[in-house]
Amino acid sequence: MTDSSTSHPLDLRAWLDEARALGELTDVSGADWNLELGAISELNVKKERPAALLFDDIPDYPQGHRVLTCSTASPARLSSILRVGHQPTHRALVETLRGKPKQWQAHAHEYDPVTAASGPVFDNVQTGGDVDLFSFPAPLWHEKDGGRYIGTGCMVVTKDLDSEWINVGTYRVMIHDRNHVGLDMIPGKHGAIQYDKHMKAGKPFPVAIVIGCDPLGYLISGIEVPFGMCEYNYIGAILKKPVSVVKGQLTDLPFPSASEIVIEGYAHPGDVRIEGPFGEFHGYYPGKAETAPVVTIERIYYRNNPIIMGSPPAKPPNDYSYSKAVMRSALLVDALQAAGVPDVAGVWRMRSAARACSTWCRSVSAMRDTRGRRDTFSASAAWAHTCRAIRSWSTRTSIRRIFRR
């Protein structure tokens, strides 16, 4: 089925125009991919009303090769992303979302993605020896990270071995070299289940990683949908319109036709490398660097002047803790009322509690900083580096503008 006129390409640039019109987007010029982007983003999201940040003029890269952070971190932007009308306050947004996830899930089967013949994502194609992940300003987000993470606000597209189930999940993606990335998937996650099935069968695991599209894509790929359901269907139910996808030339996996960057390849049986450590959502470096699947990248597709969607974790509040808190607050209100709890005036699940306790308990026993102590990491080291390193007048001016808001 091909009908792009009635489908949605998940175009990030269309959403950026909307965010700018709302007064919710700030341009930052001259920040370095090496720690500065991460430190500025972390300090920004600690504000009461943080703007989305669009970084350009990044050292070592052509003008127009950009990075976006903090996309979901305000009620105005999140309500825009979820297509629920302008909601100016946390409480209004939570109330508006009550019952919505159940509705979206119930109608998801009506919105199979629509395959388009082509799309802007194919403006440029790297193949073979031309593949170079360092063509893009993937940040080193935290000082002690194991490498540059091109995938934080990403969508990892995979397929089941023995069915037609397409899964779209968010897993961190670290660059090893010009054509290899590490893919960290927590055991039990749907992508990890599909990966394990391929490995047990001795077959290569096809992967397409979307590095930037409408934030709705990243938002839904990072939540829990029922086993066997494709996230594209869920997104379509929110949009009330199918997602427009194109097929990868290598793997035939579907990805949004207006994606900014897509890297495509295979994880081969037995091919693992050390990945991490990485400063995570609870404000710690959990555990130590460990082996993770390696994806050999054989194709890169990207738009002219591509934009990386970044979502760097940090001690809450962080880049995505607001969206998690809002979504889970809405679910909690519904659960309380369904349980017969009277006189519920409102619910707010704290951002520091926006992840499951099981995740926290599993991680906390192994949390160490790189000096061997149990301790938090924060932006302090990165920010100290930033203060030393920022020499550009334009960058300093951009930062002052951010923190006057």
Enumerate the language-model features and the residues they cover.
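Extended, highly charged
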Residues: 2-405
